[in-house]
UniProtKB/Swiss-Prot annotation:
The gene is dnaE. It comes from Chlamydia muridarum (strain MoPn / Nigg). Keywords: Cytoplasm, DNA replication, DNA-directed DNA polymerase, Nucleotidyltransferase, Transferase. DNA polymerase III is a complex, multichain enzyme responsible for most of the replicative synthesis in bacteria. This DNA polymerase also exhibits 3' to 5' exonuclease activity. The alpha chain is the DNA polymerase. This is DNA polymerase III subunit alpha. Pfam families: DNA_pol3_alpha, DNA_pol3_finger, HHH_6, PHP. It catalyses: DNA(n) + a 2'-deoxyribonucleoside 5'-triphosphate = DNA(n+1) + diphosphate. NCBIfam families: polc, PRK05673.1. The keyword Ligase does not apply. Its EC number is 2.7.7.7. It is found in: Cytoplasm. One of its GO terms (cellular component) is cytoplasm.
């Protein structure tokens, strides 16, 4: 007999069910069940995913929900016990009307009825019952509760629901009975008693409900309230229940009859996905309860609509004034308004200078005609696809932001390829000039809508979203929900804690998980020690087994960082919504992909801090010079800008701050904006391997070759190297006569590695190329290169738009360095490490950073004639409101004249003594009293005097002090400087660093400057000029110590952030050194050390070979240092690995005859691999080049995607420990496989 599960929970019943949608549906397939319901607690989070997965497996999906029903009104939120605030009820969708009603009920449960749970009430049920089938739910349902109370109460409840839902109401019966053998396995007696009481209730409810339902003509169905898949999943489920409460479920107790009130547990262990046969046996005395589930399934025929768009519409103002209009009239008016905006843009955007650039591209045509032809093409496609409203809505939002002084980025993604978007001001980079294609944005040969993402100043982002809400209606706009899942490490820790396992053992297992995104299965596969632990230790094996079951479970909800949904009518007409914790804005119940698939418009409002920095800087520049700088109108050939990049001074330049980018800028020496675009596209996995060739070709050190002459005009800009996806489209068009739309289809197929489509495209390309007179073998070669490249090629439109931001930041730094660095410091003053680096950058540019001053500093860092003035707001412990109060008073009544004047004019409700002391120690009152200890004593005395006086004045008591204040006469300070306990310079300097995050007015090394010549010290500023293999003595201050454990050797090592007066740098202390010197590794300690210089990679790397506390240095220590120094100088510390390649290092170094030793194998996770990771790894391989073969394995979602075998060009040193240790210090998503050791 077939049975349909109608009461089922997935992991979207958060922390209450372990079933993933995929495994849940697979179980139904295994049991040959034709239909399946999903009824998660109070939400529809998983509905779309469930629906699609069922359809893919030829199973009828039944979308439902186990709702919480308030016992009285949903608005009644009295402080009752959690168990008494709601009853359960199952609703299942029959059709589209039922789906809309269920969406609305689930939404209102959150927006109106939330109290412990999202709750509806009977009033809402009456209003929205159409199209729904109702089941009476479990023991927590009101009908089950009535059955336990009396037959009269039961009959009354059944009749109420029967009257409302008619034949679509079914009473529900459940029985979670276990065998005596299973009951005997319960660990504690109270659990057994709990089970017996539960079964007694279930039997009583079952009998009563079946009896009364039969008398009333109500059909009954049997369900099993599924919360996990298999019988042995009960323990994993119980662990999940207790994750949030952090309550151990295993504790040693003397009396097993006493329940643990904190432990969450289900009374039976039968809440698994039972087979139809098991259910038929369980309800053999009432077989109709099984067959009735088929009747329910037969009535549920909901088909979700994935075609219709529910996008908002745009109504021009002229039409709004008219009042009534047809949809055709509205759309025509919108199209006309769009064309009008474009006409205005043609007049204002296309300056003679810009038209001159286009004329260079098309010398035989009038440039304005070129623009208008492109616009006509775009307009035709946009209007035919019904996209006018979409573009106007985005234009309206961006236009409002700009009108209100909120900076918006120059574009993002493929939208920068559209002339229309440029004319509308949605983007700020002209696409024809830079060979950007509209077809990359909207392909006329595809139906899908494009995304237009908006970069917005961080500060103004919330205002822009609020405008969208106000413009389109609060009920039409929502954030997008996200789901936080249990990663492997977290699952192991949660399971270990819940099973009350010793923390040491839990940590031992967790540390075997190499990174945040590794799975337990992959860790077991790659780590032999973990496998052995699993085999040898039963307790560890149980933790691992349970964690594997819970890995990937949803742990919490959040909201998407950028995505906002805008609908043309109330969202609840189409999707369910909820209210996120600590948010006033509603959120969708569907995550990003599902919500877009059901026709919702997603707009990404991405907060970009760089735009805020640009805004702050340009405001300061305008205030100082009267010049209003805008990214769109900057000269793109500024000599200062390119000179700055040639020097590699990329700190504070958008997308170019990493060490790898710094080296790339220095080596490439870009001298055109197009090369800045290329830099952003090259520094990524794939094309990164071509960086040396790109550099050499630019500088004439490598020949530029083309597979066919037709490719030269396409690839000339990038020196014969494919860098952009658009170049694939161009090559297909030039060689094989593809339209740009067809070229985009080809690009997508290549990128997705769609084998079936690629077979067709290869034949099409080669055939058309042959017809165009191209040799078939050449065509095949070119197609192969295109196919290899397209999987990692970059979107040129995006690279160009972001390249403009890069150029703008470089321009500001090169031409207005004080204003730019002040803006960066203002926007990053919460990041102490970043502030320190920026101040060092200012010093390297000979720009003094001045301490805060009570009369000159404000909320922001400010560029002054002398340098950059430190912000009062950046002083630790001094809040925004205090600084605002200080500045407001200063602007209103003039500068503060003295300590007394400052205190007298202070708002005592906002300023505290502790904050005054912080301001003093930061240097803010040096203008009045440079002795900080004396200044604090005076301020405290004045503070007590004036705060007392103000209190007395408020009570109407007139004293000498209040008279004194009223006449502004000086208060006599009785503090004698001789009686003040003065702190040492070292203490004051340490306090300054605590408050400012940096040593600003001095450095601890100042005190030992006189010693440095006698210690033969080399300072950090001189490291860059030293050759490979140099040995240096140096002195540094330890700023930060980060201790780590190697996943290979499981030994401690440290990463030090150290500094001297000139610079800061990172210094690794490997495990052998760490064991010897760990007692010295303390912050704020001055160290005398010997370092070695390694230049085998693209950047300078340092290793520490010896160290001592500087305070302990004496003749003996100096002698010891000299001996170590001489020994290292006479050793060949590093082997030279450079080959002559026209002055450039080879990408990889190949040894001709590697020794027969096992290869090192490294697995790289493509889900998290970034271009910077490969660049760093490449440098490490060069650094540790040797004779031992290295294999790279690339994985995605734990599946092996590709590999580079040991017979490739990758070789490292035989002793790989240092190589592996250095990988540990990076964030490369790498795992060292078993063959590595």
């Amino acid at each position: 007999m077939t049975w349909i599960p109608l009461h089922c929970h997935s992991q979207y019943s958060i922390l209450d069910a372990t079933c993933s949608i995929k495994k849940f549906v697979a179980k139904a397939v295994e049991y040959h069940i034709p239909a399946l319901a999903l009824t998660d607690h109070g939400n529809l989070f998983g509905a779309v995913d469930f629906y699609k997965t069922c359809k893919q497996n030829a199973i009828k999906p039944i979308i439902g929900c186990e709702l919480y029903v308030a016992p009285s009104s949903r608005f009644d939120k009295k402080k009752e016990r959690k168990s008494q605030v709601a009853n359960h009820l199952i609703l299942l969708c029959k059709d589209e009307e039922g789906y809309r009603n269920l969406c609305l009920l689930s939404s209102l449960a959150y927006t109106e009825g939330f109290y412990y749970f999202p709750r509806i009430d009977r009033e809402l049920l009456k209003q929205h019952s159409k199209g729904l089938i109702c089941l009476s739910a479990c023991l927590s349902g009101s009908i089950a509760q009535a059955a336990l109370e009396s037959e009269e109460a039961l009959e009354k409840d059944l009749l109420w629901y029967q009257d409302l839902f008619q034949e679509d109401f079914f009473s529900e019966v459940q029985l979670h009975k276990s065998s005596e053998e299973k009951i005997a396995l319960f660990e504690e007696e109270w659990l057994r008693q709990n089970y017996y009481q539960f079964i007694e209730k279930q039997l009583k409810v079952k009998d009563a409900v079946l009896t009364v339902s039969k008398r009333l003509g109500i059909s009954s169905v049997a369900t099993n309230d599924i919360h996990y898949l298999d019988p042995d999943d009960w323990l994993a489920h119980e662990i999940l229940l207790n994750v949030q409460s952090r309550e151990p479920i295993r504790t040693a107790k003397q009396n097993t009859y006493v329940p643990n009130p904190k432990r969450k547990t289900y009374p039976s262990r039968e809440f698994y996905f039972k087979s139809p046969q098991e259910m038929a046996e369980l309800f053999a005395d009432h077989p109709e309860t099984i067959s009735n589930t088929l009747i329910v399934a037969d009535r549920c025929n909901l088909e979700l609509d994935f075609v219709t768009k529910h996008y908002p519409i745009y109504v021009p103002e002229d039409l709004q004034k008219k009042g009534s209009y047809s949809e055709e009239e509205r759309y025509n008016a919108s199209s006309a308004f769009l064309e009008q905006l474009c006409e205005q843009g043609l007049k204002t955007k296309y300056t003679p200078e810009l038209l001159g650039h286009i004329a260079q591209k098309f010398p035989e045509k009038d440039p304005l005609t070129v623009v208008k032809e492109r616009l006509s093409l775009e307009s035709t496609i946009i209007i035919s696809k019904g996209m006018c409203d979409y573009l106007l809505i985005v234009w309206d939002i961006i236009n409002w932001a700009k009108d209100h002084g909120i900076p918006v980025g120059p574009g993002r993604g493929s939208g920068a390829g559209s002339v229309m978007l440029f004319l509308l001001g949605i983007t700020e980079i002209e696409p024809i000039r830079f060979d950007l294609f509209f077809e990359r944005f909207i392909n006329p040969e595809r139906l899908s809508y494009p995304d237009i993402d908006i970069d917005i100043c961080m500060i103004g982002r919330e205002k822009v979203i609020n405008y969208a809400i106000e413009r389109h209606g609060k009920e039409n706009v929502a954030q997008i929900i996200t789901f936080g899942t249990m990663k492997a490490k977290m699952a192991i820790k949660d399971v270990g804690r819940t099973l009350d396992t010793p923390l040491s053992k839990v940590n031992l297992i967790a540390k075997k998980i190499p990174d945040l995104n590794a799975t337990i299965a992959s860790a077991l596969e790659s780590d032999p020690d973990l496998r052995q632990l699993y085999i040898d230790d039963a307790e560890a094996a149980e933790i691992i087994d349970m964690a594997k079951k819970l890995e990937g479970s949803i742990r919490n909800t959040g909201v998407h960082a950028a995505g906002v949904i805008i609908c043309g009518d109330p969202l609840t007409n189409h999707i369910p919504i909820c209210v996120p914790k600590d948010s006033s804005m509603i959120s969708t119940q569907y995550s990003m992909k599902p919500v877009e698939s059901v026709g919702m418009l997603k707009v990404d409002f991405l907060g970009l801090k760089t735009l805020t920095s640009i805004h702050v800087a340009t405001k300061a520049i305008y205030k100082k010079t009267g010049i209003l700088l805008q990214a769109a109108t900057l000269p793109l050939n500024d000599r200062n800008t390119f000179s700055l990049l040639h020097q590699g001074k990329t700190m504070g330049i958008f997308q170019m701050e990493s060490r790898g980018m710094q080296e790339l800028a220095k080596n490439l020496r870009p001298d055109a904006f197009e090369e800045i675009i290329a830099i952003g596209a090259l520094y990524r996995p794939g094309p990164m391997d071509m960086i040396p060739s790109f550099i050499n070709r630019k500088h004439g050190k490598e020949n530029i070759e083309y597979d066919h002459p037709l490719m030269e005009p396409i690839l000339k800009e990038t020196f014969g190297i494919m860098v952009y996806q658009e170049q694939v489209m161009q090559i297909a068009g030039s060689l094989a006569k593809y339209s740009l739309g067809e070229g985009d289809v080809l690009r997508r197929a290549m990128g997705k590695k769609d084998h079936e489509q690629m077979v067709k495209e290869r034949e099409k390309f080669c055939s058309r190329a042959s017809a165009n007179g191209i040799d078939p073998s050449i065509a095949t070669t070119i197609f192969d290169k295109m196919e290899k490249f397209a999987s990692y090629g970059f979107n040129k439109s995006h690279a160009a738009a972001y390249g403009l931001i890069t150029y703008t930041t470089a321009y500001l730094k090169a031409n207005y360095p004080k204003e730019w660095l002040a803006a960066l410091l203002t926007c990053d003053y919460d990041d102490i490490e970043k502030v320190g680096k920026l101040i060092q950058e200012a010093h390297s540019m000979n720009i003094p950073v001045l301490p805060p001053d009570i009369n000159e500093s404000g909320q922001d860092f400010e560029a002054t004639q002398e340098g950059i003035r430190f912000s009062l707001g950046a002083v630790k412990g001094v809040g925004v409101s205090i600084v605002d109060s200080i500045v407001e008073e200063r602007e209103k009544n003039g500068p503060y004249r003295s300590l007394q004047d400052f205190v007298q004019r202070s708002d005592f409700k906002k300023v505290t003594k502790k904050q005054l002391e912080s301001l003093v120690d930061a240097g803010s009152f040096n203008c009045f009293e440079p002795n900080k200890d004396l200044a604090i004593a005076i301020l405290n005395d004045l503070y007590d005097t004036f705060s007392r006086e103000k209190k007395e004045a408020a009570t109407g008591v007139l004293t000498f002090f209040s008279l004194n204040s009223m006449t502004k006469d000086p208060v006599k300070v009785t503090i004698s400087p001789e009686n003040i306990v003065r702190r040492s310079d070292k203490e004051l300097l340490k306090r300054e660093k605590e408050l400012l995050g940096v040593y600003l007015t001095a450095h601890p090394m100042d005190a030992v400057k006189h010693l440095l010549p006698f210690l033969s010290v080399v300072q950090s500023k001189d490291f860059e000029g030293l050759p490979h293999g140099s040995v240096v003595r140096t002195v540094f201050l330890i700023d930060k110590v980060t201790t780590k454990i190697s996943s290979v050797e499981h030994k401690k090592f440290a990463l030090l952030q150290v500094s001297d007066e000139e610079d800061s740098y990172e210094l690794p202390i490997w495990s052998d050194m760490y064991a010897e010197y760990q007692d010295l590794l303390e912050e704020d300690r001055l160290i005398y050390a010997i370092l070695t210089i390694d230049r085998r990679s693209d950047s300078l790397r340092l290793s520490c070979r010896w160290m001592r506390d500087l305070s302990s240095v004496n003749d003996t220590v100096i002698t010891e240092c000299d001996e170590v120094y001489d020994r290292l100088k006479n050793q060949k510390i590093y082997s030279s690995t450079k080959k002559s390649t026209g002055g450039q290092s080879q990408a990889m170094v190949k040894k001709e005859e590697p020794k027969a030793i096992p290869p090192v194998t490294i697995s790289l996770d493509l889900n998290r691999l970034r271009h910077s990771h490969l660049f760093t790894l490449k440098g490490l391989i060069r650094k540790y080049s040797g004779s031992r073969a290295l294999s790279l394995v690339f994985t995605k979602d734990n599946q092996r995607i590709a590999s580079i075998s040991p017979d490739s060009d990758f070789f490292v040193t035989e002793d790989i420990s240092a190589f592996l240790q250095e990988i540990e210090t990076t964030d490369i998503p790498a795992r060292i496989l078993a063959t590595a050791v």
